[in-house]
């Protein structure tokens, strides 16, 4: 018996049901890698960031997330080179979906009890996504803007419902606006730290400020 189609589990009807000591025997999620490309690139190398944003409250299967990840990665490698971008899948499939298996062979009515004891066995995992939640993000160089939009457009076809592509005003994966990012780095208000930054507040011990500006 094959896998039940994901359209049967599209809508968020029940409470979140994660894997736990009460919910055992859950199959592994299909998606295992959430960061692709040049993920160790410094924060100042990839200023442009594009997001795929959900426009529906629904459930996305781990198989769909894996298919979208592969699709976006393949296009970005072809168009920008394998070291020209960093993709991050922002959803993790923690919600367990169940199936109450029904026999369809002859004499099945003697072997099974129908809807008596119908609480199913774990079948797979899905990610619950809200309206306005980011599904996938890509950071890259400024000249690759069209390639980011096309990669996310192709990945959209792997999901049900409606998604929007949004080019962020922030610098890379940080929460700081691109137009003031470089000024803050020059003023030592932000310190680059891998693919993110450390924010140095104006208040605090004076010796910390002296150590930074010495």
Swiss-Prot record:
Testis-specific. Component of a male germ cell-specific 60S large ribosomal subunit (LSU), which contains RPL10L and RPL39L, instead of RPL10 and RPL39 paralogs. The composition of the rest of the complex is similar to classical ribosomes. It is found in: Cytoplasm. Transmembrane segments: none annotated. CDD domains: Ribosomal_L16_L10e. One of its GO terms (cellular component) is cytosol. GO terms for molecular function: structural constituent of ribosome. Disruption phenotype: Spermatogenic failure and male infertility. Spermatocytes show defects in the transition from prophase to metaphase of meiosis I due to impaired ribosome biogenesis in late prophase spermatocytes. Gene3D superfamilies: 3.30.60.300, Ribosomal protein L10e/L16. InterPro entries: Ribosomal_uL16, Ribosomal_uL16_CS_euk_arc, Ribosomal_uL16_dom, Ribosomal_uL16_euk_arch, Ribosomal_uL16_sf. This is Large ribosomal subunit protein uL16-like. Keywords: Cytoplasm, Differentiation, Meiosis, Ribonucleoprotein, Ribosomal protein, Spermatogenesis. It holds the Pfam family Ribosomal_L16. Belongs to the universal ribosomal protein uL16 family. One of its GO terms (biological process) is spermatogenesis. Testis-specific component of the ribosome, which is required for the transition from prophase to metaphase in male meiosis I. Compensates for the inactivated X-linked RPL10 paralog during spermatogenesis. The ribosome is a large ribonucleoprotein complex responsible for the synthesis of proteins in the cell. The male germ cell-specific ribosome displays a ribosomal polypeptide exit tunnel of distinct size and charge states compared with the classical ribosome.
